[in-house]
From Swiss-Prot:
CXXCXGXG motif repeats lie at residues 143-150, 160-167, 186-193, 200-207. Belongs to the DnaJ family. The lineage of its organism: Bacteria, Bacillati, Actinomycetota, Actinomycetes, Kitasatosporales. Residues 4-68 form the J domain. This is Chaperone protein DnaJ 2. Participates actively in the response to hyperosmotic and heat shock by preventing the aggregation of stress-denatured proteins and by disaggregating proteins, also in an autonomous, DnaK-independent fashion. Unfolded proteins bind initially to DnaJ; upon interaction with the DnaJ-bound protein, DnaK hydrolyzes its bound ATP, resulting in the formation of a stable complex. GrpE releases ADP from DnaK; ATP binding to DnaK triggers the release of the substrate protein, thus completing the reaction cycle. The gene is dnaJ2. Coiled coil: none annotated. It comes from Streptomyces avermitilis (strain ATCC 31267 / DSM 46492 / JCM 5070 / NBRC 14893 / NCIMB 12804 / NRRL 8165 / MA-4680).
Length: 378
């Protein structure tokens, strides 16, 4: 026997097919000309290919084990086993380098559709408590005329005569390794294996048409501006009647004339006169839950905040609600009649806050003096 193919692959004579294949893969990675251009390595690569061609084929292996020449029965020659009988191992070469054999067969016309997105505007109270919205969407749907097939009624897709339904065409080229077969998608059917001679007049062969429809969307309480709600299977229908993608509803919360939202809390400002701030009062306020009275305690200062617990936005996850924070702004009068000014001076005098003439103390101002400076814009 001229060549010991078992020794070439480095396996025992009783090695299993799995062991033979693993040995070939390992050597192919090491000795492939693209990895190692040494001429001696190229010869070695041809040897392992010839050995694998024989030992991976049960019939050829049996002839070889009995002392015959299995390659003489292959009907061809070619360098290194890449002759007419050697194409069966080309996928194993590809598998050794890319981890999988080259894909065969036509690709499917049926594919998943694209996702779609639409923006929906809601009011603040709808975001706080949740709501439902009817929305108009326009997406691709299955053509009812051809049921998504793309062919005109009474006709059907035909097997491509160029690739004979394989979806790819092959050609043989010669290299230093011998003959090599390469494949590419069929240019006539774009790799599908079928052609549509008479396209559907409704969808022009696409299998889909655009359609407007109404969907009801449930918007949960607590959604924030920019939140996206996923509606599975409500997006674009895929080519060839494939499954539809998803529809994403993006929430856009409109500004409110009274409240500003910060997370799940709401903020607003109430304005009261200085007398109300000094004496205390109750201020009516329209909240999301209806009319309520905000208790302003005596001595409240401008800029002070009063929380109304549980009057904010519903928590999206978990129970409860945020707070409504009321910010107090105290105003002082800009104009007073003589009687009002007299009374205010009297109050300042009673409180010891009126500044006596000729007794100025740096850094100290009474109530009336501070108010007067405010009136004059100082």
């Amino acid at each position: 026997m001229a060549t010991d193919y078992y020794a070439v692959l480095g396996v025992r004579r009783d090695a299993s097919q799995d062991e033979i294949k693993k040995a070939f893969r390992r050597l192919a990675r090491e000795l492939h000309p693209d990895v190692n251009p040494d001429p001696k390595t190229q010869e070695r690569f041809k040897e392992i290919n010839a050995a694998y061609e024989v030992l991976s084929d049960p019939q050829k292996k049996q002839v070889y084990d009995l002392g015959g020449d299995p390659l003489s029965q292959s009907g061809g020659g070619g360098a290194g086993g890449f002759g007419a009988g050697g194409f069966g191992n080309f996928s194993d070469i590809m598998d050794a380098f890319f981890g999988t054999a080259s894909q065969r067969g036509p690709r499917s016309r049926t594919r998943r559709g694209q996702d779609a997105m639409i923006r929906v505007e809601i009011e603040l109270d709808e975001a706080a408590f949740g709501t439902t919205k009817d929305i108009q969407v326009e997406t691709a749907v299955v053509c009812t005329t051809c049921s998504g097939e793309g062919a005109a009624p009474g006709t059907s897709a035909q097997t491509c005569d160029m690739c004979r339904g394989r979806g790819e065409v092959s050609q043989v080229t010669r290299s230093f390794l011998g003959q090599v077969m390469t494949s590419r998608p069929c240019p006539q059917c774009q790799g599908f294996g079928t052609v549509v001679p008479t396209p559907c007049p409704e969808c022009a062969g696409d299998g889909r048409v655009r359609s407007r429809r109404t969907l009801t969307v449930k918007i949960p309480a607590g959604v924030d501006n920019g939140t996206r709600i996923q509606l599975a299977g409500e997006g674009e229908v895929g080519p060839g009647g494939g499954p539809a993608g998803d529809l994403y509803v993006e929430i856009h919360e409109l500004p409110h004339q009274t409240f500003q939202r910060r997370g799940d809390d709401l903020h607003c400002t109430v304005t009261i006169p200085m007398t109300a701030a000094a004496l205390g009062t109750k201020v009516p306020l329209e909240t999301l839950d209806g009319m309520e009275e905000v208790d302003i305690r005596p001595g409240t200062q401008s800029g002070q905040s009063i929380p109304l617990h549980g009057r904010g936005i519903t928590h999206l996850r978990g129970g409860g609600r945020g707070d409504l924070i009321v910010h107090v702004e105290v105003t002082t009068p800009t104009k007073m009649d003589p009687e009002q000014e007299r009374l205010l001076r009297e109050l300042a005098k009673l409180r010891g806050e009126e500044r006596p003439t000729g007794q100025f103390q740096p850094g100290q101002q009474g109530l009336f003096s501070r108010l007067k400076d405010a009136f004059n814009g100082r």
